[in-house]
């Protein structure tokens, strides 16, 4: 089973007031932390979906050269998150990927173990439509989507994400993996979030 990562990095950082993925964290950047995690995982490829004008200085040179890292500027990214997701899904289709693991570039604490648990779960349940992370029964990224969902995902528009499909009776067609540590799925949206991230990284040095 071939599984790609779709790394959503085309947000407009409106709540941060500046390009949040460029913000430094030690020798890394906010946007490169989860990308490093994805590249260390068993994912076959990582499609990094960016805005067309993004010069991707936030991605370290060695990651850009990694054979699994494929940077894909999305020309319609300003039309909403669904456009970035569909850009990645189309690439997964073209490359005959059996599933796609959707990640957010602003979730710096995602671990390789989390990704591998999702991948193993999908490989153990090949007829499963999705594997989703949950916090207190709420679905959040990362989420792993079977190729059997690609057609439905390509119908999304605006700022809607895959989560809109993962509700009601459809939930019976997948698996959820509860996350008991909210820190792992923390996302950096505001200057206050960034300060929390800096403080946390300082503590764990």
Give, region by region, the residue ranges found by the protein language model.
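Conserved beta-loop-beta/alpha segment of the NTase-like Rossmann-fold superfamily
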Residues: 78-149
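Short, conserved active-site loop motifs that form the nucleotide-linked donor/cofactor pocket
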Residues: 3, 68-70, 174
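Short, glycine-/small-residue-rich phosphate/pyrophosphate-handling segment
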Residues: 139, 143-169
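Conserved alpha/beta core of the MobA/IspD/sugar-nucleotide pyrophosphorylase nucleotidyltransferase superfamily
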Residues: 1, 157-205
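Hydrophobic residues at beta-strand termini and immediately following loops
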Residues: 25, 72-74, 133, 177-179, ...
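Residues at secondary-structure transition points
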Residues: 17-20, 25-29, 75-83, 109, ...
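N-terminal glycine-rich phosphate-binding loop and ensuing alpha1 helix
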Residues: 1-50, 55
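Conserved N-terminal catalytic core of the sugar/cofactor nucleotidyltransferase
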Residues: 33-98
């Amino acid at each position: 089973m071939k599984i790609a990562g779709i790394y959503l990095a085309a947000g407009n950082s409106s709540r941060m007031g500046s390009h949040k993925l460029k913000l430094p964290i030690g020798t890394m950047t906010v946007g490169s932390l989860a990308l490093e995690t994805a590249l260390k995982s068993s994912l076959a490829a990582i499609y990094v979906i960016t805005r067309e004008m993004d010069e991707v200085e936030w991605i370290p040179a060695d990651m850009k050269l990694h054979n699994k890292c494929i940077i894909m500027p999305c020309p319609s990214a300003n039309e909403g998150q669904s456009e970035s997701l569909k850009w990645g899904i189309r690439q997964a289709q073209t490359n005959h990927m059996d599933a796609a693991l959707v990640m957010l570039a602003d979730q710096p604490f995602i671990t390789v173990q989390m990704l591998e648990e999702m991948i193993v779960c999908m490989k153990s349940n090949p007829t499963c439509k999705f594997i989703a992370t949950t916090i207190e029964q709420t679905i959040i990224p990362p989420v792993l989507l079977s190729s059997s969902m690609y057609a439905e995902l390509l119908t999304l528009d605006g700022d809607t994400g895959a989560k809109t499909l993962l509700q009601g009776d459809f939930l019976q067609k997948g698996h959820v993996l509860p996350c008991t540590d909210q820190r792992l799925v923390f996302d950096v949206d505001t200057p206050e979030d960034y300060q929390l991230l800096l403080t946390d990284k300082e503590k764990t040095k």
